[in-house]
Each structure stands twice: as structure tokens, then as C-alpha cells.
Amino acid sequence: MSKVIGIDLGTTNSCVSIYERGESKVIPNKEGKNTTPSVVAFTDKGEILVGDTAKRQAVTNPEKTIFSIKRIMGLMMNEKNAKEAKNRLPYHIVDRNGACAVEIAGKTYTPQEISAKVLMKLKEDAEAFLGESVVDAVITVPAYFNDSQRKATKEAGTIAGLNVLRIINEPTAAALAYGLDKKEAEKIVVYDLGGGTFDVTVLETGDSVVEVLATGGNAFLGGDDFDNRLIDFLVSEFKSETGIDLKNDVMALQRLKEAAENAKKELSSAMETTINLPFITADATGPKHLTKTLSRAKFEGMIDDLVGETITKINEVVKDAGISKGDIKEVVMVGGSTRVPLVQEEVKKAFSKELNKSVNPDEVVAIGAAIQGAVIKGDVKDVLLLDVTPLSLGIETLGGVMSKLIEKGTTIPTKKSQTFSTAEDNQSAVTINVLQGEREFAKDNKSLGNFNLEGIMPAPRGVPQIEVTFDIDANGILTVSAKDKASGKAQNITISGSSGLSEEEINKMVNDAEAHKEDDKKRKEAVEARNAADSLAHQTEKSLSEMGEKIPAEDRAKIEAALNDLKEVLKDESASKEQIDVKVKALSEVSHKLAEAMYKDQNAGAADGGAEKKKKDDDVIDAEVE
């Protein structure tokens, strides 16, 4: 098996790691950084930028710069969180077969395709660092991701050209990185607050076993929400001062987002910061500037209810684990948003103990994913990872009730069967509506998908026996089957849920991504060829001005003609590498006379210098000093 990389595909930033020679280490990207912004931008020239380059141009290109795509991964348009995202994000979120997608310049992209572009960059950076091709990967997801979101994440990996060996939960990966070398069994809590998601997990680690006891969280709570509170405050203050509502100005909103993110970071170490955005907008009276001094206390007042939600969830999860807070040995802080002082204070207060900040909150999840990759590959022996399903799973039964087959907190992989019957006499078909959630009624839970079982033998209601089986694999992805015991008729479905992608569509996206990769490679080669050609043209012009008189007029004319041809092709922005190379070769071939003249001139200069030195030496009179 080739090398296996571990990937933390984050809302704000992503990270990739590799397990080598007994340890897991982060792979820096081509820019030399350990994390890559999860940002994808589409330029007017048709380029696709990923990472830092995409983030840098976001202010000037807000509608075609996609960030926080993880927040709509596997989401249906009719869900509350989708509506919230649509109101918040500057790019266009559209309906694609009922699921969330984004529209860029008239073309629709699924969240899987956008995420795949981030994964492709991580893959390419890993290959450049390792010096070999990489295909196999372990990708992490928030523990509270539902089946649709997990499936969509795996599809993103497939589109990026990766063989996703395993999808594992982020807190579990962090615990694996933290607890691998722990010999004695200890119960720990991983508090994971990232850019867009929150998880809290109680685990038992020790003697190469990492067992999840309970997990919970909110797939729509994170640092982005802290930023949004600050943005709302700035918009409100600006409106009360000027009467102008910045919410209708996408470029202003993008600047506000950047400023809010920076202010949040500054307030993690400073007690006060100033937000200064000159020329944020303009009206009939002229340009307007936004300047606001913000204290840490004011910011904490904006977000205290959000932090409070995470503390409530801590109490629930500890209770689900069947332990008391006194049983917890360590509280491990994971995710960039755990740097916020209020978060640290409240978590510390909740457990009445010092927090464990020994791990890098931005990197530990990827490191754990790489360890899991090494376990699968066989490089790490005797490590047992026991994860759980975060939400209960079941089907809709008579009266719109949810009948649970698998309770939340069940260790995965797992398989469970239950027998149901018909609701009406002589019913020949049933619809199996697969649900995920904790509410009693089907309508209050998430429907992951449904399918029909037909060909049931006619019988009075309650007589037919229909066996429904739920099978969750190690990735937490669900397959459901139904079988009529009398007729033997069976039907099964691997729940695709709201990812909404068929096998054919995924294959098409894989091919499209590969084609774009070729296009990007050609575009990069053309840019490099253009830069080299520009340099050659400049050097040739300089040499002609200095040495042109020292070569025959005929040769000079040929060089000037070839130089003009090269300049002409460089004016064409769409010129390919091959077109540029032809003109570069032509100029190089006719420029040899110029090179000869320069060489002769340099040698002549050297000879003159030597003669001058000799003359000076001849003028020296040897003398002895007594």
C-alpha cells in the first residue's frame, strides 16, 4: 500500500499530515505554511485559485470567492441552517435537486466539488513534499456530522482523486494523537470548537485503545458565528451613525468579515482593538469610513450565549457517558476558536480544572488522521479505535412516529435488524423512510432518504413480516435493507441522503476535476513560459542598445524582427506555452551574434585591464629600505 495521508478538511483552514518513521508530522503547503485556507476563488480570466491566493483576493471578488463551504455540505435547501447560510454568505447559494449548491458565473457547483478543489491542493502539496504520488487518505469530519454530510465528504475525496480509506470523527482523531502513548487508562474530554462546527466527546484512552463513550455537538456553531455577531454589531452601529445599511453591499461585507476575524484574533491577546475601514462605502455626501474601538468585554458580551451553548452540551455529553466530571483526567482543547479567552474560561469553570493545551489546536486532528491511516496500513500495530454514531437512526412507522433501530452512542461498525408489518389490508408495497435524530416524530427528525419495497404478498394488515436492517460501516455511513420474509423480495439502499449525487455524477465530477487539473497545469506552464520570455525580451533589448552597433546590420535586423514577433505573441493573453516557446526559440537562434559581440567585448575589457595592470607594475621601482 502506498503512503496514507491524514486530512483535516476544516471550515476555515485545512491541514494534511503523514505518519513516517514512528511519528506523525504535518506537511507544509507550497507556501510554507502548515495550514491552508479552505477558500476557492474563480477569477475573471478563468483561473481557479485555492488557499492563500484565493483568500487574498476575496475583498475584490466576493461573489466568486467561496469560503466556509463545509457549512452547507450535505445540506438541503429547506433546512434552517441553509437559509441562514444563504443570508450570511456573499456568494450565491442555489437549489440543486433540493440540495444546496453554489452558482459561479452561471455554472452550478456542489459543495463536494468546491471541497474537492481544496483536497486536490492538499494532495498536490503532499505529493510535492513526499516526492511521490499519493492516493490513499483518511479524512476527518465533525463528530456531529449526520449521514448526508459524511457521505458528501467522502464524495469530495473521490472527486479530488483520493481513495478515502476512512472517515473518522475530528475529536476521535485528536484523542488518537493525544492518547496513543498513554499506558494507563484515563477518561478525557476533547472540546473541539472550529470555524464552523462544535463537538465535545468523552473518550477513554490507554494501552493503545481509544474508545468513545459519548459525543455531541452542533454542526453549525463555530468561529464564523463569533465573526457574524461582530459583523452584525458593526453594521448596526454604522447604520445608526450614517443611515447606510452595509448588508446590501457584498464588497463591504467581505471587508467587514476580514476585519471581524482579525479583531477576534487580536482580542485573544489584547484587551482592546480598533477596527479601521476607510472608504467602506459612499453616498451623495461623499465617501464614508468605519472606525470602531472594541474592548474584549464588549466582544465577549456578544458571544457569551454561543459559548454557553457549548457548556450546556458538555453537561449533556458527560451525562450520556455515564460518568461524573470528577472522573475526567484531562480536557483537551482542539480547534482554532478555542483560543478565545472566554471559551477557555468557561470550559475551565465547567470542569474546575486546568485545560490541556499541549496539542496544536490547528494541527492535532490531521495528525490523528495520519495515525489512523498508519493503523489501516499496518504501520501502527495493536491500536483499537472504537467510535460511536452521534445520532439515533430509525424509520417512520404508523402515525408518523420514528421507530429507532440504532440508538445514538452505539459503537460502530454495527448492524441491527427489526421486523415491521403493513398498516393496511392487502398492502403490496411499503415506503421505508430512513430517519436520523432524537425526536419522537418523523417530521422533527432529518430524513436521510427513502425507498420502496414492492411485491409484498397480499395479506391482512399486521400479518406480513418485513425485516428492516441498518448497517453502519466504520466511516459512519449507513446502508439500509428491507426484506419481505414471505416472498423473499428485498430492496436495499446506501443512503445518499441530501448529498444528491448519483454514481454517474460523481464519476463525471472526477473527470471534470482531472480535466481542470490539466488545464491548470497548462495555464501554469504558460505563465512560466511567459515570464521567461518577458525576461529574454528585456535582456535582448538591453543588449541591443548596448552592443547593437558592434554586429552587422543584417544580423541586427533579424534580432529586432524576432524580438518584435515575441513581443507580439506576449500581447495575446491566451497564448499557449507552445506558441511562446516557438518565438523564444526563434529569438534565441538569431541572437547568437549578439552574444558573440558581448563575449568579445568582455574579453577585450579583461585584456585591456590586464595590460593596464602590467603597465602599472612596470612603473614600480624595487627598493630596499634600510
Swiss-Prot record:
Top-level taxon of origin: Bacteria
Entry keyword ATP-binding: yes
GO molecular function: ATP binding; ATP-dependent protein folding chaperone; unfolded protein binding
UniProt xrefs under InterPro entries: ATPase_NBD, Chaperone_DnaK, Heat_shock_70_CS, HSP70_C_sf, HSP70_peptide-bd_sf, Hsp_70_fam
NCBIfam families: PRK00290.1, prok_dnaK
HAMAP family: DnaK
Name of protein: Chaperone protein DnaK
Organism this protein belongs to: Campylobacter fetus subsp. fetus (strain 82-40)
